[in-house]
């Protein structure tokens, strides 16, 4: 490499190190290669997978009712210990020390989830091809470029000594299990016989990957979309149409966590935990502070940059790990949580509820575990992230907690001007000065599958180096183009808060032993990236809500202006849009940049209204007026201290709105209990239908009156329309399956009951409405956009936009008449035509080709059962028999010829089970994301008295054929729970197996 380019040895230069063969003990001083991974469907590799099912619960694995009295002698243990499995598969680890408890947590993780965690570390590290073959080399290149493993190395170095010791113990436990047991069946299918030893860095990578999935975002799509609007409409009209009509920041429902809980607005710099602010928040005076409309005219992106953005976006579209991250709002990757104070409950104790939403993979993302070391004050039970130690969601003897994702904006994407010199060195340009790009060489290997040779890795030819921009928090160049004649060019770089030495996992180490609000808040100071909303309850009767994360202060926003474009567009990398570097860092700082102080992040303790709700909605209400940049931070003396910017688009708000509505309904009727909380978690009422369906009744009522246009009258008289209108008029907006083979919350413990007539009627209405929703978006929004060559918004934005347009009779703030194509003498009549034509189109579609596999061309609306459309699948890494439906008994498809299990739910419901808002074919309503865990906790009055219940979409084990592979799934599907048994006596009364351990002599 030529002078001028900084060349450093890279963690991406993986040299294949020592491995642990099945049954081989690890040796000290092994050179360990650590990898990452990524979930892929590899059913084509598994023609004989069905033969693996019977023997998959291999020797050395637990089995229900199996007792093991002989203690296993393990090097590394400090004292005697035991693992008790209860009848639900939960491992309860009782150990001499916290270190031993974490060692055995590693042991049970390997026992239950070895292949899963191997895939996870390989995903994030960009070495998945070494496991699953050359088909994912492109994904490895992209993940290696983003540098999660490099970032994890920084975090590992910054962790405290107790944290690193815990990671080491956990890794030793994983490797100890591998040394004594055969590898799971997936490895045989991939011709792998050796496992690369787990390291503390691997757990740090898993933690970094989770933070990435919950916080990373590229600004490419919104930039490309707005550029098109500008080109077609011109700057002023584009701004009005884009921000005001189509891609709105304001939510569908205005539920906002802290203002709703406290009855007062959140004022950054004035409000404090548990103390409502004194008045309405100050809105930013744009004229007085130089933030005028010209600043919002869109990014200044040249043709080369436009091409780079499209090229990179196309590259990552097939990378499910990245695509899931970028589309997490569309895919309902979020969570629900709320807490109710004892003043509103039956027993006078607080209630805490939480259900995090992620992809519904098999095995589940979370691993149930109970960790006990009385000597070291550890007694925590709940869910761990497979691949990392400690409990991340759950309870200890004093406090209980849950989490949801905030949606804070902690990523900026930049257009860089670059210069390549004749000697081959490469530079970016900042304020007219050249700054060197760091080049990291990278080599990629892949598993050669099908050649009959085990553990055969080959080197991929022609692999590109990685280009790093130090100014961007060591973020990468995603793509670039250089003119060979001049050496001048353009690049796209990205800056993410998580690239720094952040310490999220440290938070969970501290939460596992927190005793009160003070301990809890102290632990949250380490949650630097992957910003979360934390819900809290304790045995002292407190409830609380806190947001976390280091939201960077941008230099222009801090100066009360916007330089060029807002942070959610591609910004100039040549100066004026930088994150402000910290001169001095505090012990808990992670990113190295100035950030919104913790005290200015939305939070409340024991709020005035006695409850608090978050479901990824706007926590502070800063976007309710559709402008995320018109509130200021209040500094010393009440003076403005920069723009208060958290993010530009939170969840569209239907879940938070419905939870708030349901709580209000129940509290209005009296006091509530844990059963009420579980019922709200199971709620499948469509809040958007409650708002939008009345337009159908109104339109039909108008259409049958005298004097309307012939076209509108004809629609009202078309076959089946009046029947459909009647069904929707009597509907309660719930979404049961309407099928005896479907799973509904009204069923019990996985046992499916015959639906009532009321459930059948609601099921039919849900089908008709859900297809109408797609058609009214198509007719009322997409027709106009498509006709002008303008990009469509995504599902959540589309539902927000169609509500906005229906409320305005189709006339946008841009003055565009979105319903102008429809016949009618007035805007209101054209609105009615769009609404009824969409219902006519929905009925025609249901009786046509698009839904024939479900409804066989039937025009009988009684046949339109929702369960035939709304189906869930649980996908395993290798697909085929490992998935559900698959080889697991008891979970066959609900209907012949239709994949998946019929379940209640739908778009934007509390019991997250969303599909695309434009779903227009029988298979479009199938989904694979939702609650990865449900939890309700009721803190008592003394230590150890928290009653917790949970649900898991599968089981503790990831080993196909194991009795705990899917034992909890039936209860999950019918919204039933299993108890978290924290007291030893309760565990012993519900014991399935036990294993003792002792230190090696």
Question: Which sequence ranges carry the predicted segments?
Answer:
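Second-shell loop/turn segments in exported
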Residues: 101-105, 142, 151-164, 495, ...
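Terminal end segments
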Residues: 624-707, 823-1001
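Charged, long alpha-helical assembly modules
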Residues: 745-842
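Substrate-recognition/specificity elements adjacent to catalytic centers across diverse enzyme folds
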Residues: 60-351, 356, 362, 382, ...
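Bacterial N-terminal signal peptides
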Residues: 46-54
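Hydrophobic alpha-helical segments
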Residues: 411, 478, 490, 529-666, ...
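Glycine- and hydrophobic-rich flexible loops that cap the catalytic core of alpha/beta enzyme folds
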Residues: 373-383, 390, 394-399, 403-574
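Short, Lys/Arg-enriched N-terminal segments with co-localized hydrophobic residues
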Residues: 26-39
């Amino acid at each position: 490499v030529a002078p001028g380019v900084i060349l450093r040895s890279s963690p991406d230069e993986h040299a294949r190190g020592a491995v642990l063969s099945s049954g081989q003990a690890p040796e000290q001083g092994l050179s360990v290669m650590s990898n990452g991974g990524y979930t892929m469907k590899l059913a084509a590799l598994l023609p004989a997978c069905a033969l693996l099912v019977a023997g998959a619960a291999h020797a050395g694995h637990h089995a229900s009712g199996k007792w093991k009295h002989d203690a296993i002698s393990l090097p590394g243990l400090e004292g005697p210990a035991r693992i008790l499995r209860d009848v639900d598969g939960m491992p309860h680890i009782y150990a001499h020390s916290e270190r031993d408890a974490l060692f055995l947590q590693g042991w049970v993780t390997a026992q239950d989830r070895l292949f899963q965690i191997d895939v996870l570390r390989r995903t994030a590290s960009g070495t998945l091809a070494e496991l699953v073959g050359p088909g994912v080399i492109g994904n490895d290149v992209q993940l290696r470029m983003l540098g999660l493993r490099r970032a994890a190395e920084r975090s590992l170095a910054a962790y405290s000594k107790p944290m690193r010791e815990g990671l080491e113990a956990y890794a030793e436990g994983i490797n100890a299990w591998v040394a004594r047991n055969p590898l799971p069946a997936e490895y045989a299918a991939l011709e792998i016989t050796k496992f690369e030893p787990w390291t503390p860095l691997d757990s740090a990578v898993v933690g970094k990957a989770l933070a990435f999935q919950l916080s990373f975002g590229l600004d490419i799509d919104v930039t490309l979309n707005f550029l098109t609007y500008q080109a077609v409409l011109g700057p002023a009209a584009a701004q009005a149409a884009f921000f005001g009509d189509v891609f709105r920041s304001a939510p569908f429902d205005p539920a906002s966590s802290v203002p709703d809980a406290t009855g007062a607005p959140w004022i950054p710099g004035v409000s404090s935990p548990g103390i409502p602010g004194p008045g309405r928040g100050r809105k930013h005076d744009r004229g007085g502070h130089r933030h005028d409309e010209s600043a919002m005219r869109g990014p200044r992106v040249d043709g080369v940059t436009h091409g780079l953005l499209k090229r990179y976006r196309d590259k990552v579209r097939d990378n499910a790990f990245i695509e899931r991250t970028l589309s997490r709002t569309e895919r309902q990757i979020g969570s629900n949580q709320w807490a109710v104070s004892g003043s509103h409950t039956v027993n006078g104790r607080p209630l805490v509820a939480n259900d995090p939403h992620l992809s519904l993979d098999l095995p589940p993302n979370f691993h149930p575990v109970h960790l006990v070391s009385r000597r070291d004050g550890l007694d925590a039970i709940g869910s761990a992230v497979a691949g990392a130690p400690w409990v991340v969601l759950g309870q200890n003897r004093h406090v209980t907690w849950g989490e949801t994702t905030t949606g804070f904006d902690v990523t900026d994407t930049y257009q860089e001007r670059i210069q390549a010199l004749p000697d081959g060195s490469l530079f970016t340009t900042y304020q007219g000065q050249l700054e060197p790009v760091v080049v990291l060489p990278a080599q990629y290997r892949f598993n050669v599958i099908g050649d009959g040779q085990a553990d055969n890795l080959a080197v991929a030819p022609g692999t590109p180096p990685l280009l790093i921009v130090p100014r961007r928090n060591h973020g990468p160049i995603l793509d670039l183009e250089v003119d060979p004649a001049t050496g001048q060019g353009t690049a796209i770089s990205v800056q993410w808060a998580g690239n720094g030495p952040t310490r999220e996992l440290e938070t969970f180490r501290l939460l596992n032993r927190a005793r009160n609000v003070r301990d809890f808040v102290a632990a949250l100071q380490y949650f630097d990236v992957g910003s979360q909303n934390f819900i809290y309850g304790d045995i002292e009767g407190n409830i609380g809500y806190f947001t976390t994360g280091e939201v960077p202060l941008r230099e222009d926003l801090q100066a009360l202006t916007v330089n060029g474009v807002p942070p959610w567009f591609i910004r100039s990398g040549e100066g004026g849009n930088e994150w402000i570097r910290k001169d001095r860092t505090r012990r808990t700082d992670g990113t190295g940049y100035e950030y919104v102080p913790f005290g200015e992040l939305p939070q409340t303790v024991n709020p005035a209204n006695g409850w608090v709700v978050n479901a990824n909605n706007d926590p502070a209400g800063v976007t309710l007026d559709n402008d995320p940049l018109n509130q200021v931070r209040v500094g010393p003396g009440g003076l403005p201290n920069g723009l208060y910017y958290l993010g530009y688009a939170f969840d569209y708000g239907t879940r938070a709105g419905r939870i708030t509505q349901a709580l209000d309904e129940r509290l209005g009727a009296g006091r509530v209990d844990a059963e009420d909380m579980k019922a709200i978690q199971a709620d499948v009422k469509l809040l958007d239908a409650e708002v939008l369906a009345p337009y159908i009744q109104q339109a039909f009522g108008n259409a049958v009156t005298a004097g309307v246009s012939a076209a509108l009258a004809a629609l009202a008289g078309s076959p089946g329309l009046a029947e459909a209108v009647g069904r929707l008029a009597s509907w309660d907006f719930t979404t049961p399956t309407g099928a005896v083979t479907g799973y509904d919350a009204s069923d019990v413990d996985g046992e499916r009951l015959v639906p009532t007539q009321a459930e059948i009627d609601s099921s039919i209405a849900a089908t008709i409405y859900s297809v109408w929703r797609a058609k009214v978006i198509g007719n009322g929004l997409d027709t106009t956009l498509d006709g002008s060559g303008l990009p469509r918004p995504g599902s959540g934005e589309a539902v927000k936009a169609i509500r906005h347009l229906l409320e305005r009779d189709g006339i946008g703030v841009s003055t565009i008449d979105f319903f102008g194509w429809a016949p009618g003498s007035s805007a209101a009549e054209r609105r009615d035509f769009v609404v009824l034509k969409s219902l006519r189109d929905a009925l025609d579609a249901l009786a046509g080709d698009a839904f024939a596999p479900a409804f066989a061309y039937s025009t009988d609306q009684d046949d339109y059962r929702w369960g035939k459309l709304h189906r869930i699948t649980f996908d395993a890494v290798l697909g085929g028999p490992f998935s559900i439906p698959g080889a697991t008994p008891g979970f066959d498809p609900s209907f012949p010829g239709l994949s998946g299990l019929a379940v209640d739910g739908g778009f934007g419901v509390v019991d997250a089970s969303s599909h695309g808002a434009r779903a227009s074919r029988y298979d479009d309503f199938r989904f694979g994301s939702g609650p990865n865990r449900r939890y309700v906790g009721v803190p008592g009055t003394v230590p150890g008295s928290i009653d917790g219940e949970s649900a898991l979409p599968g089981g503790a084990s990831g080993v196909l054929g194991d009795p705990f592979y899917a034992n909890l799934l039936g209860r999950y599907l019918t919204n039933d729970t299993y108890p978290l048994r924290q007291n030893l006596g309760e565990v012993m009364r519900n014991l399935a197996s036990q294993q003792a351990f002792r230190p090696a002599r």
